[in-house]
Amino acid sequence: MRDAQVTPEGARIRWVELPGDPRRATRVYLHGLGASAAPYFAASAAHPALAGHRSLLVDLLGFGISDRPADFAYTLEDHADAVAAALEAAEVQAADVIGHSMGGAVAIVLAARHPHLVGRLVLVDATLDPVPVVHGQPGVSGIAAHTEEEFLAGGWHQLRENVGPHWWATMRLAGREALYRSATHRALGTEPAIRDMLTALPIPRTYLRPEADQPLPGTRELAEAGVEVVSIPDCEHNIMLDNPEAFAQATARALREA
């Protein structure tokens, strides 16, 4: 485990680091809302198709093994800047960044705001658009339907039933302010929009999606902007857990070095 101070007040991001060939691109794995990088990505990072690179399995501020400051805003921009500070401390440049769900949105903002840190992007069913809020739904939609006061006063108790035991295993580790503010800012989106940031990036970008899902909105526009959209069979939202072999092979193809 490694760590770096990422705020003036002293909050620290922590990550699990796997060693690899220093001549090859470093890989950075970013988890989704209420998750943690190692439980979601460790097997993939060690898969024969992806192993051999220095790999940082980073827990976003407020989640997993990272600190949970209650005075942090937890916007997508704030998350991206905190990750950037950690990568600078780790002496990472031009990394291959793999981001799942909200972590994919953070990865896009990271690439837009700190372009020297990101060489290629793999987005794993990442959220590109604002999310409608609906009471009782799991994840971003249900959390953001509360006010912060409601959520902190007891609304968070509903999450255990709504998200199920697997997601709850890591969600219970999150700071409650971090969970609420991250979800709310993800629901609202950014300015410029995440999708617009993605299409404007000048780096190789791949978007992995579950094959059984409805067609990804704006697929043609993404393709015209150079974003490769790849459908993965036999999986739901957690592609790397549901079909680890197909995920590893698709990610390896996206990150194949010339």
Where are these regions (language model features)?
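N-terminal cap/lid segment of alpha/beta-hydrolase-fold proteins
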Residues: M1-R12
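Conserved HGGG/HGGXW glycine-rich cap/lid loop of the alpha/beta-hydrolase fold
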Residues: A11-D67
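Active-site loop/oxyanion-hole signature of alpha/beta-hydrolase fold enzymes
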Residues: R54-I98, Q249
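Gly/Ala-rich beta-loop-alpha elbow adjacent to hydrolase catalytic centers
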Residues: G99, G103, A107
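Flexible "cap/lid" loop of the alpha/beta hydrolase fold
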Residues: I108-R113, L117-E150
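Conserved alpha/beta-hydrolase catalytic His-Asp/Glu region
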Residues: P132-V134, P138, A145-I203
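Conserved serine/cysteine hydrolase catalytic core
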Residues: R176-D234, M240
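Catalytic active-site module of serine/aspartate enzymes centered on a nucleophile-bearing elbow/loop
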Residues: V227-A258
